[in-house]
C-alpha cells in the first residue's frame, strides 16, 4: 500500500507531503495520519490541506493512517504522534493506526481535511491489513525505522524545532485539521519497544477512538511539558537514551523522559522514534484521546487539542517542541491508539474493534464498523511490551504509574485505565480516578450533562461515572474530584485557555483550555483510565496501574482529564470539549456514540456495567445525579450511555458513527460531533431533537429518536419521517428543528420522497440557502449516507459530499423522479393543476433534482414527499397550504412544516410538490386564489383548470410542461427542460423539474416577471428579462426568478414565492415593474387564476396551455401584457418585466430560429395570439402551449420579449420607437402591439410571440416586426386565422388595429383557439365579446395617456386577459397595456412606472372594466365564483394559510370590491379616468 514506507514516501512526496517530508511531517491531512505535520512542512502541508480537496486530504490521511509510516513522515514526528497517542504504538503496534480506520472516521468526524469518503474506512481497512502484514512481517522498531529512520528521525529533530515553526503551521493546520492533528509538540521517541508497547497499550487503552488521536497528542503535549516537571519523567529522560536504542528495556517512564530529552537534546534514534511511537502515549495522557473519542468517538482528532497544545506547550515548554506556541505544537493527528489486548484489558473486545484506547469509544464501535484488528502477533507483542513497560515502569520512578502494567498485562479484558502518574505522587487510584472521571465526564459531556459550567463540581460529581467504578468506589469520587482536580487545577491553572481558533470552527467559546477538561468531561482520557481503571476495578478492582504517562497525565490528566473541573471555569471549557473545538456535546456529545466513558468503560463490556453498577454508588453518588441525568439524556439517546449494554452499542455506535461518518461523508469529526452535540443537546432538552448523526440514531437507541428526523430507521419510513417532521415542527428548539429538519430532509432523501414534500424547497433550499441547515445538510449527507446511501439529504453539500451528493443528485432524483413523479402521477390531475399552478408536480421532481437550494428544507420536504407524494402531496398541498403557513412559515421548522405546509415551505423552499403548488400560490398571489387547495388538491376554477388546461383535458393545461417540453428541450434554454410533458415531467425528476420550470416560467414570466419584477426586474431587469423572462433560453435568468430552476426550482421557487408574496402582499412591488400587471393580475379578483396566468402567462404557455380557456385573461394580458409592458418598460422604461419580456422575447426569437419551423404555423396565429393574449390573455397561450407550450412559451417569451426589446430597443430602443410608434398611431399600436404582441406572445401562450417564438419566425418576425413598427405585429398579424392581419393592422394602424385588435383579439381568441388557442376561443367568446374593445381600450387609454388610443390594441390584450379571465387578467392586461403605453414613450413609460401602482389599480380597473363589459350576470357569477373561491381558500387555508395566500386572497377580495365599484363605470373609461379609477380601486 501507499501507506508502506516507500510508497508512502512517494505518495507523501508526490502529494502535499513533499514539503511535509522535508520536515518529516508525513501526514498532515490525516487526522489519524501516522505523523501529523510537526514542522513548517506542516504549515505547507496544512496550507495545502486547506487547498487540497477533502478527498485528497482524506486519502492522505487514510494513507498515512493506514501506513503509520513515521519513517516517511519523520519517524520522530510520527513517533511523537504515536507517543501522543496519535498511533496505537510502534510500527508494529501501528496496526493501531489501523485505528486509522477509526481515525479516518475520526478524521472525518473531526472535520479535518479528511474528506468525507465512503472509502475512507475501506482505505483504512486496506491500510490496516497492509500495515498488519507489514507489521507482522517486520520488526516494529525496524519497520518504523526503516520507513522513516534516516529522514524521519532527523526530520523529527528538525520537526521538533519545526514544531516551533509549526506554530504558524499548526495554527493553520489546527484550523484545517485541528480536529485531525493534535497540534502538539512531537513526542519524544519511546525508550524501548516494551515501553512503547506498554505506553501504546496504555495509550490504546486510554486512547479514544481514532478521532481521539488528537487528545493523545494533547496528552502528549500535556505530559511532555509536565514531564520535565515530573520527577519520574526525569528518570525517564535518563532512561530515554537507553530506550531510544533499547526498544524493549527502557521503561515507559524512561521513554517519557526520553521523549522530551530526545526532543530537546538529540535527534531521537530510530529505536527511540519507534519506542516513542509505541510509547508516545506514555507522555500523553490517554484520557485525552479517550476524551476525544469519548466525547466524540472521533473527537479527539477534533480535539487535536489545541487546548492540549496550549496546555502541553504551556506545561511542556521544556521540550523542544513544547517550546513553540500552541499553534506550533506538532500537528499530528492524534491517532487514537487502539489498545492491544496486552495493553488494554478490553482489547479482547477491542480486538474486534481494535480500539484499545479507542475501545472505549471507538473500540466498541470499531469492532462493528472499523474492525481494527491488530495482528495477534502485534497484540501479543504489544502486550509483552506493555507488560515489560509496565514492569519497567513499575520498577521505574513512576512505579505507581507502572501500576497499569498489571492492568495491561493482568487486566487485558478491560482497558487498563492509564493511571496517570500524579505529578506529585498522587495515588494511582487517584490518577485512575481522574481518568475515570474523565470517562464520567465524557459520558456526562456526551450525555450533554451540564458539565460545561460548574465542571469542576460537575466533574467531581461526575468523577465516578455511574458505570465506571474507581478502585475505591467511595474514595474515587472525592479523590478524583479532589486529587484529580488538584493536579489538574494546578496544572491547568498554568495551561493557557484553548486557542480561540479551536472553537472558532465550532462556535464553542474558548475557555481556559484544560486538556483534561474535555477529556475529563468527555471521559476521553479519563475514559481510558476509567476503562482501564474501571475495567481493572471491575476485574481487578485495583487502582488502574498508573500509566507511564500518568505523571504527565497526572498533572494534566489526574487533575485535568478526570479532574472534575480544575479550572473553576472548567465547566465552560468542558462544554466546548476543551480538546475539540466542537461544541458538539463537547465530549459529552460523543457520549451518545458511546464514546464517552460509556465507550471507554465499555471496552470491557462487563466493566462499564460493573463500574456503573458498582461504582455508580460512589461515582454516581456525585456524578450519577448529574451524569445519570446527562447520561440518561445522552446514554438513552446514545446507545445506552456508558453502561455495559452500551459497550456493544457503543461499539456499534462507534461503528455506526464511523460508518455514518463515511457514508454521510462528514467532512470532519468535528462536524459530525457538532451535529451530535447539537443533537445531544436537542435530545437532552427534547428527545425529539435527536441527531440522526448520533450513532444512537443508527443504533438501537433510534426508538428514542423515532420522532427525530435524523433517525436513520425513521429516515426510511416516509410516514415516520413525516411524523418526525411534524415532531420537529412541534419541537420547540429552533436549532434542533433546523438540524432535525435538515437531517429530516436528508432522511427524506433517504426515504426518497419525503424530502420533496416536506420541504418543497427542500431540494435547493436547505443547505445552500440555509447555512445552519447546511451544517445539517452535511450531517444528513453523512446521515443519509450512513442511513441510506441513496439520497442523503438533498443538498448542495450533499453534492459536495461526493457519493452522498451523487446519491442525492441521482438517487434522489430518481426517487423523486420515480417516487415523486409516480405519486404525482397518481395525483397528476391535481398535481397538474397544482403543478401548473405551482408547478408542484413539475417542481417536485425538479426540486428533487435540484435540492441544492432547499436542501435544508429539503429533508423535511423529502419526507413530506415520501409521505405525501402521490395523493398526499396535493392533498397535503391543501393541508400544506393551510398548515404550511404554520410549519412552513418558519423556515427552520420547514422540514416539519414542509410536509404539512408546503405553502409556507414554498415560501421557504418551493421545490417540493406541495411547496411547488404553494410556491405557485406564493409566486402568483393569484395562484393562491386560483388554486384553492381543497383537500390538499388545488381547486381551480374553470380558469384555473384552463390555466392548466386541466379542464381542457388535464394535460393540455400542462401543455406548457408537456407540449413545450419538446420545444423547450429543443430550446435548450431553461425553458426546454421546463417544457417537458407533464406526464414526463411528473415521471422524471428532471421532467418534473422541467414542468416545474415551465410553470415557474409561466408564473415567473407572466406573473413573476411582473411579480418578480420586484425581484427580477430590479435584480435583473434586462438579464432578468431575458433570463427570467426567457425562462427556457435563460434558465438562469428565468432562474433569477427561476434561477432556482437552474440552481433548483426550489430555490427559484422560494424567491418566486417571496416575490409572489411581495407581489400579492405588495402589489406595489409588482407595480414596481410591468410586473404590476402580473401583480395586478394577482391583485385582480382573478388572483386564483392569476397565479397561473401571471406565472403561466408570464411563464409562457405553461399556464395558458393548461388553462387556455381560463388562462387567456391571465396568460395573455397578465403575462404577455405585463411582459410586453415590461419589455417596453423594461427596455425603455425601467420596467424590468417589460425589458425582461423584450429581452426574453428577443432571446426567444433567437431560440425560435430552431423553433421557427414549429412556430411558423403559429406565426400567423402569433399575432392573433398576441391579440388573444392581450384580449384573452389565456386564449393565445393555450394553443401555443400545446404547440410549443413551455419551452416555446418560455422561449417565445424570451423571443417575444427580446424582439419586444429588440423592437423595443430598435423601435423603442427604450421602447421609445415601438412605443412611440404606438403613440404615433401605427407606431403606438406597434409599440403597444409589440409589447402586447410580444407580451401576448409570451402571455398568450406565445399566442403570437410565443407561437412565433416557438415557431421561431413568428416570434422573431412578430417581435422584430413589432420592434420597428409593430412589424412583429405584422408577423403576428399574419393571422393564423386572419387574426394576424388584424394584428398587423393593429401594428400598423395603431388606433384602428387597436380596435381591430380588440375585435381581432376576440376573433383571435377563437382563431388562436383554432390554432393553439382553441380553448381561448371559448374563453374569448365568453369574455372577449364583452371585454375586448372597451376593456382593452380603456386599459390602454388609461395606461398610455399619450398613446393610449393607439394602444387600445394592448388594452385589447388586456381584454383578452379579461376574456380569458376577465376578473384577473384584464387588470394585468391593463397594466401590461398601460405599461406598454407608458412604455411606448419613454415619458409614458416613466408615466407607466408611476402608474405602476395605479396600473395595478388600473389592472383592477381594467379587470373591473372587463367585468363591466362582461354581462352583469356573468360578472356577478365570476365575482361570486372568485369570492367563493376566496372563501374556500380562506376556509381551507385560513388557519395555516400562508401569508402570501392570505394576502392574495385579500388582494383578490379587494380587487373584487374594486371591480364591483369599478364595474358601474362603463368599460370605456378615459385612460386617465380609468387609471384614477384603477388607483382608487387598487387603493
Curated annotation (Swiss-Prot):
<feature type="coiled-coil region">
    <location>
        <begin position="1408"/>
        <end position="1438"/>
    </location>
</feature>
<protein>
    <recommendedName>
        <fullName>Protein ORF C</fullName>
    </recommendedName>
</protein>
<feature type="compositionally biased region" description="Low complexity">
    <location>
        <begin position="529"/>
        <end position="541"/>
    </location>
</feature>
<feature type="region of interest" description="Disordered">
    <location>
        <begin position="135"/>
        <end position="268"/>
    </location>
</feature>
<feature type="compositionally biased region" description="Polar residues">
    <location>
        <begin position="841"/>
        <end position="876"/>
    </location>
</feature>
<feature type="compositionally biased region" description="Basic and acidic residues">
    <location>
        <begin position="609"/>
        <end position="621"/>
    </location>
</feature>
<feature type="compositionally biased region" description="Low complexity">
    <location>
        <begin position="190"/>
        <end position="206"/>
    </location>
</feature>
<feature type="compositionally biased region" description="Basic and acidic residues">
    <location>
        <begin position="680"/>
        <end position="689"/>
    </location>
</feature>
<feature type="compositionally biased region" description="Low complexity">
    <location>
        <begin position="1204"/>
        <end position="1226"/>
    </location>
</feature>
<feature type="region of interest" description="Disordered">
    <location>
        <begin position="518"/>
        <end position="653"/>
    </location>
</feature>
<feature type="compositionally biased region" description="Low complexity">
    <location>
        <begin position="894"/>
        <end position="909"/>
    </location>
</feature>
<feature type="region of interest" description="Disordered">
    <location>
        <begin position="680"/>
        <end position="911"/>
    </location>
</feature>
<feature type="region of interest" description="Disordered">
    <location>
        <begin position="949"/>
        <end position="976"/>
    </location>
</feature>
<feature type="region of interest" description="Disordered">
    <location>
        <begin position="306"/>
        <end position="334"/>
    </location>
</feature>
<feature type="compositionally biased region" description="Polar residues">
    <location>
        <begin position="596"/>
        <end position="607"/>
    </location>
</feature>
<feature type="compositionally biased region" description="Low complexity">
    <location>
        <begin position="474"/>
        <end position="483"/>
    </location>
</feature>
<feature type="compositionally biased region" description="Low complexity">
    <location>
        <begin position="1233"/>
        <end position="1251"/>
    </location>
</feature>
<feature type="compositionally biased region" description="Polar residues">
    <location>
        <begin position="1116"/>
        <end position="1125"/>
    </location>
</feature>
<feature type="compositionally biased region" description="Low complexity">
    <location>
        <begin position="141"/>
        <end position="153"/>
    </location>
</feature>
<feature type="compositionally biased region" description="Polar residues">
    <location>
        <begin position="1188"/>
        <end position="1202"/>
    </location>
</feature>
<feature type="region of interest" description="Disordered">
    <location>
        <begin position="1013"/>
        <end position="1061"/>
    </location>
</feature>
<feature type="region of interest" description="Disordered">
    <location>
        <begin position="383"/>
        <end position="506"/>
    </location>
</feature>
<feature type="compositionally biased region" description="Basic and acidic residues">
    <location>
        <begin position="740"/>
        <end position="749"/>
    </location>
</feature>
<feature type="compositionally biased region" description="Low complexity">
    <location>
        <begin position="754"/>
        <end position="774"/>
    </location>
</feature>
<feature type="compositionally biased region" description="Polar residues">
    <location>
        <begin position="699"/>
        <end position="710"/>
    </location>
</feature>
<feature type="compositionally biased region" description="Low complexity">
    <location>
        <begin position="220"/>
        <end position="251"/>
    </location>
</feature>
<feature type="compositionally biased region" description="Low complexity">
    <location>
        <begin position="1148"/>
        <end position="1158"/>
    </location>
</feature>
<feature type="region of interest" description="Disordered">
    <location>
        <begin position="1089"/>
        <end position="1299"/>
    </location>
</feature>
<feature type="compositionally biased region" description="Polar residues">
    <location>
        <begin position="1096"/>
        <end position="1109"/>
    </location>
</feature>
<keyword id="KW-0175">Coiled coil</keyword>
<feature type="compositionally biased region" description="Polar residues">
    <location>
        <begin position="1258"/>
        <end position="1276"/>
    </location>
</feature>
<feature type="region of interest" description="Disordered">
    <location>
        <begin position="1454"/>
        <end position="1483"/>
    </location>
</feature>
<feature type="compositionally biased region" description="Polar residues">
    <location>
        <begin position="622"/>
        <end position="640"/>
    </location>
</feature>
<feature type="compositionally biased region" description="Low complexity">
    <location>
        <begin position="424"/>
        <end position="449"/>
    </location>
</feature>
<feature type="compositionally biased region" description="Low complexity">
    <location>
        <begin position="1284"/>
        <end position="1299"/>
    </location>
</feature>
<feature type="compositionally biased region" description="Polar residues">
    <location>
        <begin position="252"/>
        <end position="264"/>
    </location>
</feature>
<feature type="compositionally biased region" description="Polar residues">
    <location>
        <begin position="157"/>
        <end position="170"/>
    </location>
</feature>
